[in-house]
Amino acid sequence: MAVDGIGGIFFRAEDPDALRQWYRVNLGVVFEGYTPWQQASGPTMIMPFGSDTDYWPDNKQWMNNFRVTDLDELVSKLRQADIAVVTDPAWDSPEVGRFARIHDPEGNPIELWEPAE
């Protein structure tokens, strides 16, 4: 017997209701109460990084990576909402896809990933 998927991602928040609203409005991620977020977009990576990684801020223990269909469209929407978005062509590759990074209102790092076709 083995694990066959992620059952949930749980994290602390100063204002859980405001954070749920932010994720819903800006990323389309809906998580309310104990109703699971249904996704059918593909596999999920689970990967530990070294404690000295500079892939995300060192004052945070984790970073969420969300798969997106149209990175340019979402980046435009986020910037229109005055959300700082960082992109770097060095992060992108034809084999893996394209990336952008943002932070939620509580400073949690979020990576947005448009997989390669």
Please tell me what each predicted stretch does.
Residues 1-5, 11, 32, 75-117:
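Vicinal oxygen chelate
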Residues 5-7, 60-64:
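Short amphipathic alpha-helical segments
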Residues 10-12, 65-67:
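Short hydrophobic/aromatic beta-strand micro-patches
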Residues 14-16, 69-71:
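Helix N-cap motif at beta-to-alpha junctions
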Residues 15-30:
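Amphipathic alpha-helical segments
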Residues 18-19, 63, 99:
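Secondary-structure boundary/capping motif
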Residues 22, 72-77:
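Short amphipathic alpha-helices within nucleic acid-binding modules
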Residues 27-62, 102-105, 109-115:
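Conserved short beta-strand elements that form part of the metal-binding/catalytic scaffold
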